[in-house]
């Protein structure tokens, strides 16, 4: 029997606890926030998700929303806005949202930027490099890398990017597929046929030897070719075959191996991505690629012992840099912030 679900979402503080008697006890949440969520569910159409204004503000940019106007809600003096969730948006992280709203001044990272520039020059000279930007949350890992890759693009150096996300640990190869989608120039709206065509065009341009492995790459991207399915082989052998192909691409003379590859937030990588990351790291030394990875201090991996790996720890911003941020945000009057006690790891 076909059925559809409707969902209502609201955000805010609630009271939680056990409610009932000795015969029946439930753990539940109560309060106005819960009531408004129930109201959103009641007005949602079948198969739709309806959001309150508060929730809509929290997910702005992460999802595409349709403004449905105001409705009258029992217990609320004024009509409330409600929204329909239509599709996934372009934002994936807080940094994406900050960039869309306008970033603060980039200060206090001259030493780190110089280290990345030096690693890039070594890589372009034929000694591939791996640089690990490590720091606690909020120290500016993403901002440093964003500034660096923009400089690279200004010099017409190709950049491939992939990023781990907290909710993506259960999705195999999510950050790696993001990186390779950029390599094959696959868009979000490309269907299976277009995706297969772009992969085949790029690989066969490099050589006919890739034709026999196309079915495996199609499978990796979730677009198997019904007319030419991949052979049934052991999963471990299949993984080795795919890793071998991707490693071969990085070493292929037909591949213009002078990319900057940026993989962010390794601490949120799934197991399959971690395994492939090790393959990528091992592929770097004999290329002209610069691989930059970012992670928090608790992340560790065996490949960090490689001689071509360079850690780049981010130290807290010094007071002069902090005051530079304040001047950018608050203006030049030092009296307005002279007596502030400042943390040195602002989210920028």
Show which residues each predicted segment covers:
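Key residue(s) within conserved catalytic/signature motifs
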Residues: 1-17, 27, 31-340
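Short conserved micro-motifs at the rims of enzyme active sites and ligand-binding pockets
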Residues: 20
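Short, surface-exposed beta-strand-loop junctions and turns on beta-sheet-rich folds
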Residues: 23-24
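Single conserved hydrophobic/aromatic residue that forms the stacking wall/gate
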Residues: 339-348
